[in-house]
UniProtKB/Swiss-Prot annotation:
Species assigned in the record: Pyrobaculum aerophilum (strain ATCC 51768 / DSM 7523 / JCM 9630 / CIP 104966 / NBRC 100827 / IM2)
Listed Pfam families: Ribosomal_L23 (PF00276)
Annotated gene: rpl23
InterPro entries linked to this entry: Nucleotide-bd_a/b_plait_sf, Ribosomal_uL23, Ribosomal_uL23-like, Ribosomal_uL23/eL15/eS24_sf, Ribosomal_uL23_CS
Entry keywords, A to Z: Ribonucleoprotein, Ribosomal protein, RNA-binding, rRNA-binding
Family: Belongs to the universal ribosomal protein uL23 family.
This protein's name: Large ribosomal subunit protein uL23
Job description of the protein: Binds to 23S rRNA. One of the proteins that surrounds the polypeptide exit tunnel on the outside of the ribosome.
């Protein structure tokens, strides 16, 4: 369901300022499915999920983590930073 983590300047700024991680997911995935998958895979709690379809036809999800979890810490644990 989760295809990859987006690592762009905007994605890193969102992780730092708004505690959000940015993912590319399957087009058929619902917000609830995305939230459950992120919670299961990364052992964090999700507060909110926003999605959009990019001009390239990919589905992008902005996943806001609860205050107990830090998006930058998660990205560094995953080896993205």
């Amino acid at each position: 369901m989760i295809k990859r983590i987006v690592v762009t300047e905007k994605a890193l700024r969102l992780a730092e300022k708004e505690n959000k991680i940015t993912l590319i997911v399957d087009r058929g995935a619902t917000k609830k499915q995305i939230a459950e998958e992120v919670e299961r895979l990364y052992n964090v709690k999700v507060e909110k999920v926003n999605t959009l379809i990019t001009p390239r036809g990919e589905k992008k999800a902005y996943v806001k983590l609860t205050k107990e979890h830090n998006a930058m810490d998660l990205l560094s644990k995953l080896g993205v930073l």
